[in-house]
């Protein structure tokens, strides 16, 4: 009896995981999350430049951030949208892809390129 209830619970939760139709509110939330990933990546790049982080930490953390950005890219590229915002949603998907690419580059932990990546991530995320 517990197994069918568990399966039903999982089936009900799956659509809530970055699924469904993208409306203006969801687009704003996803956009803010993508900006946050870019800004967090910029902070990590700053630590690399300053020598304030280790290579394993940078590799793992940048990889996790890149995966999350890639997930937004995939979801926003495929999900249906409410009328009138499809272009904005697809543009945000492209931005998420750019952020993911930059974060993958940061995984290499190259201090020379980290300074450039920091600037590009700050620009993508419109970081303060």
Which residues fall in each region the model found?
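Bacterial N-terminal signal peptides that target proteins for export
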Residues: 1-7
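C-terminal motif of bacterial Sec signal peptides marking the signal peptidase cleavage site
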Residues: 13-16
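Bacterial lipoprotein signal-peptidase II cleavage site
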Residues: 18-25
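Alpha-helical segments in soluble extracytoplasmic regions
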Residues: 26-104, 111, 115-127
């Amino acid at each position: 009896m517990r197994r069918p209830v568990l399966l039903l619970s999982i089936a009900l939760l799956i659509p809530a995981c970055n699924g469904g139709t993208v409306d203006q509110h969801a687009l704003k939330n996803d956009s803010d999350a993508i900006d946050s990933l870019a800004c967090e990546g910029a902070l990590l790049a700053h630590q690399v430049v300053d020598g304030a982080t280790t290579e394993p930490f940078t590799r793992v953390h940048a990889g996790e951030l890149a995966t999350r950005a890639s997930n937004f890219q995939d979801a926003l590229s495929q999900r249906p949208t409410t009328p009138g915002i499809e272009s904005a949603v697809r543009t945000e998907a492209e931005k998420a892809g750019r952020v993911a690419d930059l974060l993958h580059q940061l995984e290499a932990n190259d201090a020379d390129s980290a300074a450039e990546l920091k600037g590009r991530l700050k620009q993508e995320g419109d970081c303060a």
